[in-house]
């Protein structure tokens, strides 16, 4: 199955290729910022919260979805999570390079999950993208990422990677501790992402 995602596409022109880019965990350091906020939320020294986590953050003492939702809601509404994350190294550089080469960058994120907070979530997202110099052609707020019609996807969520690949879509898994079980293609850095995209279209 791993080699399936190395197959080259010889029918695409760079100027027509849309790259669907996840935001949290791919462009923005979601887990790094959440760790800071969780330290405050649980009133625990940050050194007690491991940097290496699994999906659901059980390593920080979260035992059920309700606890995760409470922490996440606090992070978003009270600590401006969407506008306070650091950029993942290389995201700005290589997305700008891909954009300059004619690829269309489509940012795809599922952030409209808190009722009556949509306008703020959108504004924080746009402000973050602009302040970090992340280029994009489109910005899509959607849960089902297969619906956005990209040619290449960069994603870190194990569920989303499986769903996209299940539809036969070329998907690069941006590696972190939550998705180590996911097969190739895997990128350990944004330079890896860039090299994989170039290999796919060359």
UniProtKB/Swiss-Prot annotation:
Top enzyme class: hydrolase
Named cofactor requirement(s): Mg(2+)
An example Gene Ontology biological process: pyrimidine deoxyribonucleotide catabolic process
Record: residues binding Mg(2+): 22, 24, 156
SUPFAM superfamilies reported for this sequence: HAD-like (SSF56784)
Signal peptide: none
Pfam families assigned: NT5C
Active site: 22 (nucleophile), 24 (proton donor)
Keyword terms: Hydrolase, Magnesium, Metal-binding
Keyword Secreted applies: no
Record function comment: Dephosphorylates the 5' and 2'(3')-phosphates of deoxyribonucleotides.
Protein name: Putative 5'(3')-deoxyribonucleotidase
The species this protein was found in: Chlorobaculum tepidum (strain ATCC 49652 / DSM 12025 / NBRC 103806 / TLS)
């Amino acid at each position: 199955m791993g080699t399936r995602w190395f197959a080259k596409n010889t029918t695409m022109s760079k100027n027509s290729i849309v790259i669907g880019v996840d935001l949290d965990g791919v462009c923005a350091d979601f887990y790094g910022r959440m760790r800071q906020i969780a330290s405050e939320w649980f009133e625990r020294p940050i050194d007690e919260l491991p940097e290496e986590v699994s999906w659901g953050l059980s390593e920080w003492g979260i035992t059920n979805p309700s606890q995760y939702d409470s922490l996440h809601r606090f992070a978003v509404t009270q600590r401006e999570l969407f506008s306070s994350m650091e950029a993942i190294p290389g995201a700005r550089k290589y997305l700008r390079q891909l954009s300059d080469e004619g690829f269309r960058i489509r940012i795809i994120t599922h952030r409209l999950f808190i009722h009556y907070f949509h306008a703020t979530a959108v504004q924080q997202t746009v402000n973050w993208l602009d302040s970090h110099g992340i280029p994009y052609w489109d910005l899509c707020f959607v849960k089902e990422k297969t619906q956005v019609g990209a040619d290449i996807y960069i994603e870190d969520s194990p569920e989303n990677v499986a769903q996209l690949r299940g539809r036969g879509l070329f998907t690069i898994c941006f590696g972190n501790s939550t998705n180590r079980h996911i097969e190739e293609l895997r990128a350990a850095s944004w330079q890896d992402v860039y090299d994989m995209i170039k290999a796919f279209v060359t």
